[in-house]
Design a protein with these regions (language model features):
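Conserved P-loop NTPase motor module
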Residues: 1-21, 120-181
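Conserved P-loop NTPase motor cores
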Residues: 1-115, 151
């Protein structure tokens, strides 16, 4: 609890120093599980500063979170992230169907983009295993794409605990060989 904000600030400060020194080189910082950082007012202020500054130095900031609510519920970062994000990537948002009007307004989505987002994974081909994802580029282009991964890629990135346990049990039976499992 104490080390998380300290470690995060050290990493982000190192990025900001590099960002300022490396001229003409594209820089990127990706903040995974951003909800943890956004939950802290000090960290949220830091992310706001980062978003307002990074583009001036040929850089990009990306926040990844499972809930749109994490971003829109933070008054500190909400406007800076949304106003400085030319690219929006959204997965299935059906669980927000009842409050999608406010999400649409906040993200500045057109009715076409709203329809695209709410169509995600609604009519997937039954014979194929894929998930759909929405991309919007600067509000001028948007589309829904299918992403299909190999079984190996799926098991590498799945967060389903039961699937991971099954995979590790099979690997144990095969002498610890995850590739064979």
């Amino acid at each position: 609890k104490i080390l998380f904000p300290i470690t995060t600030i050290i990493i982000m400060e190192a990025f900001i120093n590099k960002m300022r020194k490396l001229k003409g080189i594209r820089k990127l910082i990706l903040i995974e599980e951003a909800w943890k950082a956004i939950a802290s007012a000090n960290m949220a202020d830091y992310i706001k500063y980062l978003y307002k500054t990074v583009r001036k130095y040929f850089g990009e900031a990306i926040v990844v979170t499972q809930e749109v609510e994490d971003i829109i519920s933070s008054p500190i970062v909400k406007e800076s992230i949304i106003n400085n994000s030319d690219c929006k990537i959204l997965l299935d948002q059906r669980k927000y169907l009842n409050k999608f009007d406010s999400i649409q307004n906040l993200l500045g989505l057109t009715d076409k983009e709203r329809s695209q987002i709410l169509s995600i994974n609604m009519a997937n081909h039954p014979g194929r295993k894929y998930k759909e994802v929405f991309f919007s580029l600067g509000g001028t282009q948007s589309a829904v794409y299918a992403t299909e991964v190999s079984l190996e890629e799926y098991y590498t990135f799945t967060t389903e605990e039961s699937e991971k346990m099954e995979l590790f049990a099979l690997a144990d039976k095969l002498g610890g060989n995850l590739e064979l499992a």
